[in-house]
Amino acid sequence: MWAEVLGAAAADSGAGRAALEAVGSLAVVYCQTWQYDDAATRLAQRLGVQPPCTVNTGIGGTVPAVAVVEASEAMRRGELEVAAVVSGEALATRRARKRRGEPYRASFPPPERRPFPFEAPFHPAEVAHEVFQAYLTFALFDTARRAHLGVGLDGYRVGLGRLWARAARVAAANPDAWFPEARRPEDIATPGPDNRMVASPYTKRMVAIMDVDMAAALLLATHRAADRLGVPPERRVYLRGAGLALDPTYVAEHPAMWRSPAMRVAAGGALRAAGIGVDDLAHLDLYSCFGSSVYFALDALGIGPDDPRGFTVTGGLPSHGGPGSGYVTHALAWMARRLREDPGAHGLVSGVGMHMTKHAFTCWSTDPAPVAPPPPAAAPAPETRPVVERLEGTVTVVAATVLHGRDGDPERLVAVCETPEGARGYAVGTDAELLAAAGEVELVGRRAQVRPDGGVNRLSWDGGDRGSAGR
């Protein structure tokens, strides 16, 4: 798949085989389908090229954008002329084979299986309370935003249905989409046998689909190298600006869980480098693994969810598909197509890495900048709240989601809680009355009781602190 899409990218550039032979840096985005001993070197051998530099990246939704930015900086320094970034996953095939009981064997496996390349381990409190899955953590951010806006439980989910229906319409026109099907907002927002609740407020049709077979490749070159290779001017799309920034590593560390200060920094940096404002953007692809990743980016840009420009050029990760760490390669490839069809326009592509921690924004246009865009400015270190493992007594719920089983029934509530002293921690609840209340009443902002129990904080709520929030 990697070789196929790189060959297609070379042909699409108009330079053909010469573009591949000119590649000085070949970056392969981390593959989750199976491990290789050295994916980038093996790919170079398959292509019959010998780039001086091969890179096997780490994980996360910002990885392709960071690889592009790093290549552009090497070009600015005169160290590189042509680079390639490629990603691919065959998770759908792997899962299908597993269901059928068929063995699979990866080519060129490492001598020993390597651990998943997390840059930062989970916090001990996250381990104790099983705060691992992205559908859980991003749901927590959405519930904090919902409470901050004062929107009812049902109303917020209806809004998510409208958001994803807009994306599904784009996916329906995308021949590369995994689910190229337009859906009505109510078909996305309403739980049912074929659209179960996953983690409130998310139904199945609101979450990224990773089990896809997809690959994408990008070829990057200096203006001079593109001239030498004979890339036609109408095939060129230029990086006009980039911004990178970090939010806190751990979910509970985020001081205001309803927004992303780092997104504002990164987006602002990309736009300033490009010399444009938000109103100058014609096309957007905002990282869309879950609702909060889209909403936080829209909020950071000052754009409403009903903006006529939309927020995706692919159809979004729930409909287009989210192939591991590689989605942004697909977004950038589709953005290049859009901009070729709309010469002179500007497009913005974002990436989100880990649990709302890493953020990358890149701005593009068919018009080159008068001068080379500056490197991303250094972003300030994020503010954090202290996270503790043990909670006891009265706390305030900062964010809360109910996880549902495959039958759609609620199984467990996970909450981020704050002590009177301002420390944060996690708590869980499985009481039937609590789970029922969480489906009827906004728990975020309410007081609750927590007691430690064998390394896990147990949350209880007597319903007395109901206030006025509701459905």
Feature locations, PLM:
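C-terminal substrate-binding/catalytic lobe of Rossmann-fold NAD(P)-dependent dehydrogenases
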Residues: 354-355
